[in-house]
Amino acid sequence: MKILVINCGSSSLKYQLIESKDGNVLAKGLAERIGINDSLLTHNANGEKIKIKKDMKDHKDAIKLVLDALVNSDYGVIKDMSEIDAVGHRVVHGGEYFTSSVLITDDVLKAITDCIELAPLHNPANIEGIKACKQIMPDVPMVAVFDTAFHQTMPDYAYLYPIPYEYYTKYKIRKYGFHGTSHKYVSQRAAEILNKPIESLKIITCHLGNGSSIAAVKNGKSIDTSMGFTPLEGLAMGTRSGSIDPSIISYLMEKENISAEEVVNILNKKSGVYGISGISSDFRDLEDAAFKNGDKRAQLALNVFAYRVKKTIGSYAAAMGGVDVIVFTAGIGENGPEIREFILDGLEFLGFKLDKEKNKVRGEEAIISTADSKVNVMVVPTNEEYMIAKDTEKIVESLK
């Protein structure tokens, strides 16, 4: 089954055409600067990279251009659009409506629209992509795969905040969690690599990138995760503060004479390791500054980041009554051996020994703990697009 996987941002559109049977990526690309001057589509297929400069006034234009590229006689990979069996859409927020991926109907689209206030930066773009695809490919089944759905198995005592209960009933203020598709994929893949049933494992998945979150996955289900009502809660991140004392917001409003919105903007875009280091949100830059130039604030930023990850791993081991597997994934998790070692140092009491030679791995599946470790520590590159394609395939197959 050929599945087109679409991930729409406010001015961008990432896509992959995947053969779902074997996960083979037939083509992939990125449409940038949608609705802005100098729009560009970068299309990768058959080992070639094609750049197409053409104005895209909206997501519909972008999807038309993507489809044109896919069927192009020179650099396309399919003869015509009828070869696309289904479209899988990444949707950031499904609120409490969705516990799994779903076939997109008018009712589903309305529910996604109702979640806009929970994800004002992301859901509108996701909706644009869905509507555009429906207009261009009205007869092709479409599936929504939610970042939040995997975490809908959290128990109420894990997802409720200790604030007046009426705010939950009135406004649905609760922990939702994000990166669910990634946490689901790497936990399942880790179990496959170990050749053990996921239903028997306690897994801690660490998705560490510019946005970072950790999940406690017990018997294949998410029982807790570090991001919350929004992706601002939890770990220190590239530019996001993660969890802080809520009183800091009103304190900064008063001291700096700024609005709540301005403070939240600072916490989202000017904080995290960027805020502490004053240098960059890119961990490669921070490692260079800290280890090559001896920059104290860059070192401090890395310490704060690693400490919060370490603390969360420990707390999730407690929440699950132990741990069998710790998995690192995403940009930093997959490609940062030094950061991984830094995080794991002091956690040996959980039952693992790090193999420093194996830990040198970057961007590949590997078990990086020693053979005699009771707990397996692993690197598993995430593959959210493949997970979206597999979910889409499963739902479309069930319609037959």
Swiss-Prot record:
PANTHER family per UniProt: ACETATE KINASE (PTHR21060), ACETATE KINASE-RELATED (PTHR21060:SF15)
Binding site for Mg(2+): N7, E384
GO terms, molecular function: acetate kinase activity; ATP binding; magnesium ion binding
Cellular compartments per GO CC: cytoplasm
Source species: Thermoanaerobacterium thermosaccharolyticum (strain ATCC 7956 / DSM 571 / NCIMB 9385 / NCA 3814 / NCTC 13789 / WDCM 00135 / 2032)
Residue numbers marked as site, Transition state stabilizer: H179, R240
CDD domains: ASKHA_NBD_AcK_PK (cd24010)
Family recorded in the similarity comment: Belongs to the acetokinase family.
Cofactor comment text: Mg(2+). Can also accept Mn(2+).
Subunit structure: Homodimer.
Protein name: Acetate kinase
